[in-house]
Amino acid sequence: MEKLKFEIQSVPLTLEKAPVICGVVGSGNLEVLVSQHDQADVCQVEVTTSAVGFQHVWQSVLNEFAQRHAVAGLKLQLNDMGATPAVVNLRLSQAISMFKGE
């Protein structure tokens, strides 16, 4: 298992919401936990993954996601079991929609 940490610049999401969880930890899938944190200018991301050596891929996927969604001020905790970048984007989008109550 590899543990990665990122701080990503994004537009702030200004909602007072309870934490949410989306997805499941299973083969080819991942779980996303979304909560707020006190730094309004960055999104904190922690990734625990079974796929070792893909930090650059995670960085690219997360940067692209943060450009499409306002996520600064949030903490994203991802528990991954080999999800593809497309599945990561899907789960992140679902988790943010759930957090926003959409």
From Swiss-Prot:
Cystines in this chain: none
UniProt-annotated location(s): Cytoplasm
Principal cellular location given in the protein's record: cytoplasm
Superkingdom, taxonomy of origin: Bacteria
One Gene Ontology MF term: acyl carrier activity
PTM notes: Covalently binds the prosthetic group of malonate decarboxylase.
GO cellular component: cytoplasm
Keywords, alphabetical: Cytoplasm, Phosphoprotein
Residue positions where O-(phosphoribosyl dephospho-coenzyme A)serine is found in the record: S27
Pfam families: ACP
Function: Subunit of malonate decarboxylase, it is an acyl carrier protein to which acetyl and malonyl thioester residues are bound via a 2'-(5''-phosphoribosyl)-3'-dephospho-CoA prosthetic group and turn over during the catalytic mechanism.
Similarity annotation: Belongs to the MdcC family.
NCBIfam families in alphabetical order: malonate_delta
The name this protein goes by in its record: Malonate decarboxylase acyl carrier protein
Lineage: Bacteria, Pseudomonadati, Pseudomonadota, Gammaproteobacteria, Moraxellales
Annotated gene: mdcC
